[in-house]
Amino acid sequence: HVGFINVDGEKMSKSLGNFFTIRDVMEKFHPEVIRYFIVSSHYRSPVNFSDFALKEAKTALSRFYHSFKAYQQMYGQKIVETLEQGFVERFNAAMRDDFNTAETMAVLFELNKELNRAVKEETAEQATVLYSTLRYLTNILGLVQHDVDEFFFFFFFHEALYLSDKEIDNFIQQRFDAKRAN
């Protein structure tokens, strides 16, 4: 990525005190979420970095993992060499269009939606082709590289480490209120 990095709408700089390293960010966010965040914007456009934006990236990336989990629960890890060419062609066209990753993401989310529909309707052959296609295309961008359960396990425990004092106090109060209600 070669665009400027903005932090909450301001250009990142040491003099403004809004400077951080990638290591700092990786202490709070899964590396694949950071990758998704960067890949989802055009490589020459400025990136507006914020915790909120990274949380949105986590939510978006999680949609792929949820779909993969739903497929795997129905059909296991089965993949086929046959790919849904319409999606592959649209993805490739977006990549040839000055690495238009915003458009590639639109293609991936449309494909993800079709995969979810096929899994829900239990059309095994179609679901397998769509799953195989989505795996292939996300792989090109280096996304959805982890075991589904490991990915979600990371968030369950990692995010608990970064609860604010206020969030911890809220959980304590909720527990206290629940005990008192019983």
Label the predicted regions.
Residues A106-N182:
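Basic, alpha-helical terminal appendages of large translation-related enzymes
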